[in-house]
Amino acid sequence: MKRIPYRISDYENLIRKNCYYVDKTMYLEKLEDLDNTLVFLRPRRFGKTLFTSMMSYYYDINSKDKFDELFKDTYVYDNPTCNKNNYYVLKFDFSGISYSGDAEKIERQFSEKIYNGICDFCGKYKFNFEIDENKESSMMLLSLLRQFKSLFLDNKIYLIIDEYDDFTNGILKNSELFKKYIK
């Protein structure tokens, strides 16, 4: 019997638990026809995390063996795009950053999220990259991209950033922080 999902934001988990799912995979085809940079502007609790999770499984080169199981009975199962399971997916999740305290604390938390995303990426694909967590987040990303490029792989990175709005809204709500970041 199908279950009603509650607080499930991981696509694979939702499918394995046999939960109801409103198929939104037909949008993948449409999104691929758009620009390379996509931003989803929807209110909180509107399914962005689940949608980006579904995108992650669809585009992830490591999910190729699970495609039939995860996407049967969906639009994209019968109409796959040429980008199906064709990327190394790098995902950042900025949820949970605390905006109380000073700017240095927030920047440290932001850098931790970047570092954790990079570590997850390297672990998932078994890349033995050296990333210095004490560097600025931009330098960590630059290091990752340089090392990735040096491998001369045929597949590219697909970047997914979740809860980017949580991070920016937190800064916008604090006028002192906002002033610091726009200088």
Which sequence ranges carry the predicted segments?
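Phosphate-binding site recognition
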Residues: 1-183
